Amino acid sequence: MVAPVLETSHVFCCPNRVRGVLNWSSGPRGLLAFGTSCSVVLYDPLKRVVVTNLNGHTARVNCIQWICKQDGSPSTELVSGGSDNQVIHWEIEDNQLLKAVHLQGHEGPVYAVHAVYQRRTSDPALCTLIVSAAADSAVRLWSKKGPEVMCLQTLNFGNGFALALCLSFLPNTDVPILACGNDDCRIHIFAQQNDQFQKVLSLCGHEDWIRGVEWAAFGRDLFLASCSQDCLIRIWKLYIKSTSLETQDDDNIRLKENTFTIENESVKIAFAVTLETVLAGHENWVNAVHWQPVFYKDGVLQQPVRLLSASMDKTMILWAPDEESGVWLEQVRVGEVGGNTLGFYDCQFNEDGSMIIAHAFHGALHLWKQNTVNPREWTPEIVISGHFDGVQDLVWDPEGEFIITVGTDQTTRLFAPWKRKDQSQVTWHEIARPQIHGYDLKCLAMINRFQFVSGADEKVLRVFSAPRNFVENFCAITGQSLNHVLCNQDSDLPEGATVPALGLSNKAVFQGDIASQPSDEEELLTSTGFEYQQVAFQPSILTEPPTEDHLLQNTLWPEVQKLYGHGYEIFCVTCNSSKTLLASACKAAKKEHAAIILWNTTSWKQVQNLVFHSLTVTQMAFSPNEKFLLAVSRDRTWSLWKKQDTISPEFEPVFSLFAFTNKITSVHSRIIWSCDWSPDSKYFFTGSRDKKVVVWGECDSTDDCIEHNIGPCSSVLDVGGAVTAVSVCPVLHPSQRYVVAVGLECGKICLYTWKKTDQVPEINDWTHCVETSQSQSHTLAIRKLCWKNCSGKTEQKEAEGAEWLHFASCGEDHTVKIHRVNKCAL
């Protein structure tokens, strides 16, 4: 089998912050499906890898549902609804997309879907019955048979909304029944009669909006679990009403019955619904309830009577009836502790109930696994994580061992490979969250291997250094020698970091601070009840990636410096290759505010202000030989600054303007978003919203002339879409051509090679090599592409003769991806 040219090897993401966007497939080794921005992600929790991305929605995915098979085999179809007003039916084969069918008709965002396989007496072939609810106050019912989809019916709720949906079949019949949980605090029950759904009941009892409903069949009875913002869970029992004419003593107290009659195959059947129980255990809104799915064990179909609920009180509860009394009791309660969190949106069982997962308010997933020896004990497990909003910037560490990302979710995250001695496969995970900020983060740059500077929607740049506890855990997880890594670090490294009660900056915690903490008993005796525990950090040695609770509190990096000088929000920052000089720029509408500030990374003093551009500088890049600084701007021009060879006094300029373009000489007609240098520092590349990529040069660092006119040295490459990111590989193609990655506003990444042909004008200098497939692409604008330093230390040794290049991408679709390229196959 021929190896692909481009592979996506690792993906980092998390579910959208909405209810119902997470669903676990039934059947053995079921996949977890969740919506990330506009994508549906299929994740394998056992292998801990993203299997594929299903891209088809054009706005946020709000709800997902696997279609369960009656025989307990793995699901191969799922439905999703999004803010683009459409429902998509996905068909999966061998964990890859086979077919997608779009269901259009809603006039508002779709936020609830459900589907079942339906067998009709008149037609032996299965059809799929799909129901969806949207913000247009309508519930639509669809029938899909083969490639054909037909809208059967629209249920209109006037000014109300159906917030939760679930389909099933009435006991001993093939008649579909639909439960709709509404904002009128009622559950509306519909049954299909003559191909039309008719309302048969309204169940009252909840005192606030219904957030979740789900059917489950136990023997000849059908049970409905419902949850609400009134903090309660109700379980309703639906059964065939006895037709016996036996007289009943009216003096006996019995539950109120809601009855209705259905005609099935010309036979009228009476059904009754009673309230089975009310479960009170949560202290805030209950957002989701789910029954444990049916599964096969030793060839026998099992249907455990267990219910899982998730609430905004930060807990998830597993309920089950007592074997002796039949009273429903709380079996297990799990949740998250500490941090800036606000509870759970959703929860799911895996196929046999041995694992449960919760979806938290800030997008994080929490996975627990049942102990095989002690079934009442559940332990946290490793699960995928990522940003819950747009990812704005990323950078590899100088040795290519990990990546750091920043996003508009106000977090900085560090991802690294987890190497296990007993497994050959290397998986990447989030191992630290160095910065949890109060502003949207915009940019970052590495100063050395364990130090970075970040910029946010504020006027200040912040510098962070890794604490000792991070370095220890990083070495343990990635399988590196701690002594080798620590030999290049200061001996007085802090242990960790914490945020003071009345502070906003990460404060270093040293060994003495930890040792002086009182014991729990001492604290109880001496505390007046009003003190705030200043040092929340506790060092811990990890041998595997940390859980979300640990990431929130124990992986902060201390802030070592603030850099003041800009008048508006920081927009971009970069560092030279020797890590001695930092350049930063902020948002600007005037020339004086668009100045680039150069900082000394040892003294942290301002070295120089470079004034040229009239609008925001969007990106900067030092040349690899450190002779030049390139800047591109929203004013559609670029400027090139040359480092002076003479040793200047402290306050004299270090860089002088070497070359620039103006409105006449600029090839670009729109904002220039990105720029990068060739590895030999001869040429630089610019990418713009006008869909053009241009190469400029040559840049001669020995030229001492005052005025320079550097023009395009390539043909203008039209990539067919707005360019938002450009990155040049530090390794040349075997044919001595430059390898260029171009990221587009639509989320696609294209790889080209370029070589100067010395023809006038330049022709055939660009070669299109490969582009990302639909599942590999991002779904929104790419914000940054970054090639890895090609040492290849963190990846498996590939077969002889195949050399892989690695680059990372991030975008507005909340996703970070690591791709690998076969250099020889380009």
UniProtKB/Swiss-Prot annotation:
Listed Pfam families: WD40 (PF00400)
Keywords of this entry: Cytoplasm, Disease variant, Intellectual disability, Nucleus, Repeat, tRNA processing, WD repeat
Compartmental location: Cytoplasm; Nucleus
Effect of mutating residue 636 to A: No effect on interaction with ELP1 or ELP3
Reported function: Component of the elongator complex which is required for multiple tRNA modifications, including mcm5U (5-methoxycarbonylmethyl uridine), mcm5s2U (5-methoxycarbonylmethyl-2-thiouridine), and ncm5U (5-carbamoylmethyl uridine). The elongator complex catalyzes the formation of carboxymethyluridine in the wobble base at position 34 in tRNAs.
Annotated SMART domains: WD40 (SM00320)
Annotated disease: Intellectual developmental disorder, autosomal recessive 58: A disorder characterized by significantly below average general intellectual functioning associated with impairments in adaptive behavior and manifested during the developmental period. MRT58 transmission pattern is consistent with autosomal recessive inheritance.
Species for this entry: Homo sapiens
Record text about domains: Folds into a two seven-bladed beta-propeller structure which is required for elongator complex assembly.
The protein's name in its UniProt record: Elongator complex protein 2
Keyword Isomerase found: no
Predominant cellular place of this UniProt entry's protein: cytoplasm
GO terms for biological process, alphabetical: regulation of receptor signaling pathway via JAK-STAT; regulation of transcription by RNA polymerase II; regulation of translation; transcription elongation by RNA polymerase II; tRNA wobble uridine modification
